[in-house]
Amino acid sequence: MVFKSKLFFSSKKSRSSSPSSSNSPRSVGSDSPIRSDKKKPKSNSKEETRSPNTKKHVSAKGKEASLEVHSSSPGKSNSSSSGSEAKKPITETPATSDVKEESPASVSPIMASSLGLNRIKTRSGPLPQESFFSFENDYAIPVLPCYKLSKLDTGKKEAGSSKVDIGPLRSSNPALLASGTGQFKVSPTISGPEGSAEVCTPENSYDLDDPKESDSPRYQALLRMTSAPRKRFPGDIKSFSHELNSKGVRPFPLWKPRRLNNLEDILNLIRTKFDKAKEEVNSDLFAFGGDLLDIYDKNKESHPELLVTIEDLLVLAKTCAKTTSKEFWLQCEGIVQDLDDRRQELPPGVLKQLHTRMLFILTRCTRLLQFHKESWGQEEDAVQLRQSGVLHSADKRDPTGEVRDGKGSSTANALKVPSTKKAYSQEQRGLNWIEGFFVRPAPLSSPYNETSKDSESPANIDKMSSWKRLPSPASKGVQEAAVSKEQNDRKVEPPQVVKKLVAISDDMAVAKLPEVSSAKASQEHMSKNRHNISWGYWGHQSCISEESSIICRICEEEIPTTHVEDHSRICALADKYDQKGVGVDERLMAVAVTLEKITDNVIQKDSLAAVESPEGMKISNASLTEELDVLSPKLSDWSRRGSEDMLDCFPETDNSVFMDDMGCLPSMSCRTRFGPKSDQGMATSSAGSMTPRSPIPTPRPDPIELLLEGKGTFHDQDDFPQMSELADIARCAANAIPVDDQSIQLLLSCLEDLRVVIDRRKFDALIVETFGTRIEKLIQEKYLQLCELMDDEKGTIIDEDAPLEDDVVRSLRTSPVHLRDRISIDDFEVMKSISRGAFGHVILARKNTTGDLFAIKVLRKADMIRKNAVESILAERDILINARNPFVVRFFYSFTCSENLYLVMEYLNGGDFYSMLRKIGCLDEANARVYIAEVVLALEYLHSEGVVHRDLKPDNLLIAHDGHVKLTDFGLSKVGLINNTDDLSGPVSSATSLLVEEKPKLPTLDHKRSAVGTPDYLAPEILLGTGHGATADWWSVGIILYEFLVGIPPFNADHPQQIFDNILNRNIQWPPVPEDMSHEARDLIDRLLTEDPHQRLGARGAAEVKQHSFFKDIDWNTLAQQKAAFVPDSENAFDTSYFQSRYSWNYSGERCFPTNENEDSSEGDSLCGSSGRLSNHHDEGVDIPCGPAEFETSVSENYPFDNFSFKNLSQLAYINYNLMSKGHKDETQPSLQRR
């Protein structure tokens, strides 16, 4: 039909002027085509159907008037993009001729139903005149919505009356007939000074016979009312047919105004809650500011260094309180992130607590904003576009249908500006937390000028919580679970929230501003800031981290707390290959074999799950450890460890020893190869003994022991395809030929494939990620080795792939090529010196990555070689590696440098019994009984393992923070006499008169001791060199018990020769009995000090010692759980006041200087894990830890220290478990690291 085509063409001409259909993105419910398709008739129908603009019904005679209103000067038809509303008088200009010619001069009215126009921009119900009114004529009278007319009239008082008589209008005005035949669009938002020029733009109009009808007073009144600026949003304008039957009419499928209205209500409700939360934040900030002022006044003189930071917090609190809710909506995330960055950089103390408190206040708003963006951020864009009036501004149209280039196009382009609301934009990120506390006024359109494209982009959907740091792979799953829980708690479950969060986690590095360049940099920075604080001891860390993750002490990577036990076992299994003294290819192949065996066991376990018992469903321990038999033969006979060949091969058995711990320990057995299990793991320093002679039952199986036995089930069984891929990648990398030109590219390809496999993991911190990380480090290590072999011409490959080079260099730093350099003294921060020993000294140090405190025994290589002490230190290390007893000090690392050896052990702050006796004189018999009983249990364990201490004395009995005893210093153990040519001649022993106050010169005397050990505590057979069996330790126990009760050793004298005579002749000065010593105590001491070792008490085992009447009140099974009489009360984690050397020392920097008048008496006894032997040589200076340059120096091949480096995986796993088991305790309580 000609009329129909012209009708559509006329509509197209009027709509083509809308800038929203040209440059603006499509809004919700809109699908307008591009400008190049404007002449296609079909596009008009589609636009008419999808356009969200509502219609007003007007008579056909209204075309002339509407064209007069629609026409305006070219300069005024273009408006600015600000979206501001302004009222402008209607300017009437002649309509363009081309438009008039296209419309017929006279056309008979046609029912809307005949053209299908009843469905344009209306609900799909029946026609109003057919369903509501029973008029006999062919033309029904449309009903105007009364609520709109009343609102329009009240908004324009100049219309002449405050009400419109709707009744006469309906019955008498013929211009409003045929509601479906003529419609015009009302755009209530009038932008710019020319805003009223397009108030009424007819889309479909007809030129009827009566040209004077437009001059009707009623029509003019209606025109003025509908032309007035209004405050309602376009979404609130509904078509007539919708209003006639708003309830019960099915919504139009392409446009859902009721849904959008409901969403607007929800968003308005959220903003209202945000405003209320902002008021509460303001109140809390004012109270917080008052507290800051009080703290400022109190610390003005005592702590001036705190004042600057407190002033900054005051300024920030005041600024946030004065910020309006709308501005705070945009800026709160940036403020919180900057504040959290500063908090992580602060050490524990008042300032960090103040930052935490302010974060607690401000995050009340950020949490609400986070919930809003995660739930409704994408849907809000369409509402904001509609509310802003940009897409519906009437001043964007001109009669010719062409879009002007000037301001109109700039308005459309403004819509493409990145969202300032999401991810807090560049303005928010640029807020400097000190200099930028002032609030920058945001542009008026900033909260709204967002496009649908921006909102649909995963990088621009709100960043979960954009102030939080980029989550590490280990904590990603935990964060998703936490967000999901928050969504469920709020009973808002929008679809695909989890998918959005995953996409956000992957794309945040790209979406973030240049300050945070990549996810890797953010993760490393987070780990560095979070864990470089003075946590020190690990026993009482409640708030492990904000994201429920800890740093694994084995791999030193962040892992979720839910997988600590499984990860510890898996990580220990993967880490052992870095312990092996083999090449990269062998280690890669070993990893591949292990992965294949794990996969086979998982498949076998699944096939037998239906018929096997729960124990049978566990993974086979033997199959997981078979590969160790190939790499390192096991040492089955511990009795051989005292021999020379055992010392030669023992470094090769370090990992088999550990794997025996993992796989060969029977469940809940009383006696194990490595000693009894601890009932509380690291939770107590004295958990009891489970040796066969005195089993101490535990209340529950030790999770760590079960973990190391391999009895835990794998939780990532569904990842075995990825395990197979990891094994293939490891084999491929191992088979890369070093001389092949394609080896570099092959390794790079393996790295790329490896990262893809790791990214596809289903679980964090378990087999795929843990083994994948190990394989990656090994491949990078081999990559460096190959690069070193390439000539300069081929070395340009490294420069062509700079990111991979950065990764390789980073990997080399964490996993060096040389085995002995895997850990160094540079990984520790030296805090202070604790004591001085024969070959070095003991220092208190803190691990840089974890903050744990350790006692490091520093030994000089040259002194040990010169004094023939090499075997003794190797034996001590081996004993500590294998020790598994709550009364024996724990060992964690050993490493070496060019000058020194380092033994890293647990730091026990209670001091030693020599220091205690020096302060309090002697012990009462009840307390001495308990302490000696714990020593008996420690010796029972050591003797059952074939270890003889041979240097027991109060100096080597340490006090843990819970007051229980720990045995240390095994330097003379197993090896016997170090140098039989050393004599005992020299000045008087320091132990001769420990508590004689009338000898004040004791600290300044030149005290010497033999390399054999302290003469006062040595058994006769050791002095004579005729024997050095286990009974020698029981002799020392009798000496120690005597000293506990009396205050001095029984054989003390002024000269070593006199001590020698007293020991051989058994000259004992007994105190009065029973006044100062009970009969039971004297009898026990007398039997322990029997000259004949075969007749000595304890010659037939510890059982006869424990059965003595002196211990009749001791409950050997619960001794570890009993509360000690003395519990150390340290001021802080670094307090070493309980240690008192036999000499006085001045600490300056990292050096210990003797206060002795004789400079050659620079040797002191050990106080924490160091040997008590003193040298007769006078040229031994103070040990200083090696620096980086010294560390790189290789050790001579003639020195037997090449395989000295070791990482005690099982003890590190205990720390992981202890962090979890002690997580509920108050972190403010001072506590020191313990097992």
Swiss-Prot record:
Residues 828-1111 form the Protein kinase domain. GO terms for molecular function: ATP binding; kinase activity; protein serine kinase activity; protein serine/threonine kinase activity; zinc ion binding. It is an enzyme of class 2 (transferase). It holds the Pfam family Pkinase. The keyword Zinc applies. A zinc finger (C2H2-type) spans 552-571. The active site is at D951 (proton acceptor). It comes from the Eukaryota. Residues 393-407 have a biased composition (Basic and acidic residues). The modification Phosphoserine is found at S32, S1010. GO terms for cellular component: root hair. Residues 1-33, 71-84 have a biased composition (Low complexity). InterPro entries: AGC-kinase_C, Kinase-like_dom_sf, Prot_kinase_dom, Ser/Thr_kinase_AS, Ser_Thr_kinase_AGC. Transmembrane segments: none annotated. PROSITE patterns: AGC_KINASE_CTER, PROTEIN_KINASE_DOM, PROTEIN_KINASE_ST. Belongs to the protein kinase superfamily. AGC Ser/Thr protein kinase family. This is Probable serine/threonine protein kinase IRE3. The lineage of its organism: Eukaryota, Viridiplantae, Streptophyta, Embryophyta, Tracheophyta.
